[in-house]
Amino acid sequence: MNISKIVYAVLTAGVLLTVVPSCNKDDNNDVNNKVNSNETYSFENEDAISKAKIAGKVAPEIIPWSETYNDFLVKVGSFSSKIATAIGCEQSKNTAVSPLSVFMAMSMAAECAGGETREEILNMLGISYEELSTNIQELCYECNRILGYYDEEDKDKAKNMIKCVNSLWIKDGANVKESGIESLTTNYYSDVFKMDFLNSNVNELVTSYIKNETRGFLAPNLELEPSTLIMLMNVVYLKEVWNEYGENLGLTDQKYDFQNYDKTKTSTKLLRGDYNSGKALVTEKYRKFYTSTNSGLDLTFYVPNEGYSVDDIYNTDVLDDKTSYVYSDSENRYHTRCIFPEFSASYDSDIKEIIKSLGIKSLFGGCDFSNLTDQDVFCGQIQHVTKLEVKKEGIEGAAVTAVMMMESAGPAREELKDVYEDFVVDKNFVYVLSRYNIPLFTGVVKKIEL
């Protein structure tokens, strides 16, 4: 079956998780009791249930949903579109960006910064410090949760989860302020490490930490410079299934000719998603619809119309468009399912220059980091690493963002006819993974491989 449509897909999955530090923390607020070192830190063989128990200590009360928090999420969504399109898509491969991970890492930088440096970071994020400090705990809380039902007797069901873990890595002997550390551990539930960055095993330890937090899914070598004084790091991990019983999605009976970005075609069977309420949105440049996972993550596909490409629609105007789907009219109630390919995507690069292009200057030369340290520091690198897999079994993704600071420098209708439609994703596409307007991963798929 020949396919002539180009596909732009947005995979949106924001999920709730109870915020938790990556190692057990007691209720003692003494900063020194929260600090780990090269010699004392040992990785736990932890699971999602133990994470949830720890989270009960740091977030014992659920903050009621408010209009203020909803407005905050809208601004997080706007930043997500801005950073995703600024990073763009690599020409030769599928790309994944985690706006949530970048937002968290840069928010921690804003917490540590002062003066002009803080102001520039906040302007890039599109929020005020008051908005950030008021809402960041709830954002952390919502991005750390076990997905789906589980009980103590069935720990396998707790493997589906979303985690958003923050950490502060400090050079052993660095002059840092306990008040700054306390802000990160209290508001961002950050782990704290004092490290000898000259030690030959420091990169191995950081890699092990990331691997531990992502259940082995992601294990990059960040290649820390010996001159590193402070590192602010965020790790995001997501694992989810399509349905309550963890069953694989079925494949189409016939093969489709998926058109890749370079105009070549890949003949393959596609996955059949479940029907969701609504009719695909069609605009001049693209059409879009979504498929959902068991716990409500939405994978939205943007498919360019004839004469347009993913380059024409991978922009903030499209990603920020809030036009609603049509769910029914005077005669019909609409149901649509997505027919889409399995795919994988990744990213691994220093995004410092991209962050500069968004208006941040002082962070990279003689910056004000006075809420954490009075030493002269500058940001030498912002490494962003991601990996995402969308398969018949479910979705798994992970991301790391590391900011490295160096020394110096309406009413229901009745009796409507049900209409069922297919939304076929049959060409290269853009995706966003989010839930509750919190984008976790965004990128472009230009080619699928069998």
Regions inferred by a protein language model and the residue ranges of each:
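Hydrophobic helical h-region of N-terminal Sec-dependent signal peptides
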Residues: 11-17
